Amino acid sequence: MSLDKRDLEKVHVELPKLVDQLKEGKLDRRDFLRTSTRLGLTASAAYALAGLPEPVQEAQAATMGGTVRISMRVIKIENPPIYDYVYDSNIARQVCDYLTRTGSDNVTRPSLLEKWQASDDLKTWTLTVKKGIKWSNGDELNADHVVWNLTRWLDEKVGSSIIGLFKGFLVVDYDTGQKDAAGKAKMGTKLYSDKAIEKVDEYTIRLNGQTAQLAIPENLFHYPAVILHPKDNGVLGVGSIGTGAFTLTEFELGKKAVLKRRDGYWGKAAALDEVQFIDNGDDPAAAIAALASGQVDGMMEASTSQYAALQKIPNVVIHQVTTGQTGVARMQEDKEIFKDPRIRKAMRLAIDCRKVLQIAHLGLGAPAEHHHVAPVHPEYYKLSFMQQNIAEAKKLLAEAGKPDGFDCEIFCKKDPDWEAIAVGSMVNMWKQIGVNVKMNVLPSAQYWDHWMVEPLAFTNWTHRPLGVMVLDLAYRTGVPWNESHYSNPKLDDLLTKADATLDVEKRRQVMKDIEELMQEEGPIVQPLWRAVFTGMNKKVKGFKMHPTSYLFAEEWSL
C-alpha cells in the first residue's frame, strides 16, 4: 500500500501509530482493521495495510428476478428508534438505510455517508453524506434529513435506546424538578447544547461532543438508527419513503411482510423481484416444516432444537458465525430481594456456565463470565474463569441475611427455545444454594410487557462489534434499555473512560476493571455466548450469516 505517514495523518493523527503497532506485533490484524476504519481509513486501504484481501461479495447470478421467502417473526415496525429486537429492523433495513454498515467481518464502512472524520481528541465527528442518493419519492438525501433523525433519536420523549450510546458525549442528565414515589429527584436526558448536532452545509453534519467517543461509526449502525424521511413523521409502514432497495407493499402483523424491488435505488440494483418474511410463530417445528416443504427458502436464525433437523433437509446449507450474542438473567437492584450485591454474586456463583452452554446450546459458542464482554470484542480482558462455587454462594447468602435461601420468580420467553432451556438449567443450579426460582415462560409477544418490570427476567442480547456498546446500552445509569435498573457511578465513569480510549490495549485495561466490577457487584447472571446459525436453501446466492442476524436482501439472488 502506497500510503505514507503524511497521508495517514491527513485521515487521523493516530493512524501512523496503529500501523507501527501492527508491524511490531502489538496489534493483531483484526483489531487494526476495526480501529483504523473507525478513524476514517477506507476498508480497502485498511485491508491492504494489514496484508489481507478484502472480502468480496459473491457475484450476482446472471438471471435477475424471483422471490425469496424467509421465516422470521413479523412484529410491529411503526417506530424504528424504539425497536428492541432484530426482527423489526430486518424489515426496515430493506426499505431504509443506515449511515454506516458493520459487515460480517465486523468492519464498519460508510453506507449513506461518503465518509466520516474524527478530531484528534475524538470529541468532534464530521459526517459527510453521499451526494446524489434519492429517496423513493425523488427527493435527494441531505444533511437536514440526517439532522432531523439524529435529533429525534436523542429526544427523551421518543424513548430510543440510542440515547445510551450517546450519553455523556451528546446527551446529559438533568433534574426535571419532579419527584418519584420515594421522594428522589426524577432525572431526564437532553442534548448538552443546541450546538451538539450541527449542520455544516447541505451534505455535512458535525457532532460536537463534550467528551471523547471512539465508537460513533458503530453506534450509527445500532439497529434502531434507521434513517427515515421527515415527511413520514417518524412512522414506517406500507408505502413509506425510503432510500433502500425495496418498498414495503404488504404488512400483516404476526403473519407476513412483502417487499418489492424498486427502481432508482442508489446502490447496485437488487436482483430479486420480491422478498417475503413469513411468521411461523413460537413453535420451532413450524419453521423447520416450512423450510423442508419449500414454503420458505430460509430462516433468519435457527435455534439449537432445530439444528439436527436442519442437517437432514436436502438442499439446505447451514451458515454459522461466532458472535457476541447472549442471554442474561438480570436482577433489578432497586428491588428489595436483589439490593444486596452479595446476593447477586451468589446467584452467579451457583451457575456452572459450561454445563448451561452444553444443555441449552449444544456447546455451540462459549461459556460466559457474567460481565457481558465477549472474547470476540477487541477490548475483552481475559480474567480467571468464574467457576461454580456452591459453598461460597451459600456463605454470601448467609452474610446477606438469607442463610436458608429465598423464593423468587423468573420471567422468560418461549421463543427462541434455547432461552427457556438455559433458564431451566440455571433454576436447577440455584436450588443447590437454597434459592427456589419459579419459571414463568411467556409467549414472546407478552414477554416485553414484563421486560422492565419484573425483579428477575432472562433477556436475549444481540451482538455488538464493541464491548463498550452493549455496556453503554444496558448498564449506564438511567439509559432506556437499563432493564436491571442498575446505577453505579463507578461503572459510569469507567465506561466514559473506555469510550474515550482509542488504544485497544489501554482500553482493555479499563475493561479489566469493568469486568471485575460486574462480576463482584453487577446485576446479571450470564451463562453463555452463542454461536449463531441458520439454514438457507442452496439456491439463495449471496447470503452471509451476520453476527447480529441482520439480513441484506439486496445482496441476494437465485
Residue ranges and their predicted role:
Residues 1-31, 50, 54-55:
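N-terminal secretory signal peptides
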Residues 70, 138, 301, 422, ...:
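Periplasmic binding protein-like
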Residues 71-120, 239-243:
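N-terminal lobe/hinge region of extracytoplasmic solute-binding protein
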Residues 102-107, 179-198, 202-204, 208-276, ...:
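Gly/Pro-rich hinge or "lid" segments in bacterial periplasmic/extracellular proteins
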Residues 154-158, 215-217, 308-309, 319-320, ...:
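Periplasmic-binding protein-like
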Residues 198, 345, 433-447, 470-538:
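Extracytoplasmic/peripheral linker and loop segments enriched in polar/acidic and small residues
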Residues 364-399, 414-421:
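Structural transition elements
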Residues 534-558:
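Long beta-strand-rich cores associated with HINT superfamily self-processing modules
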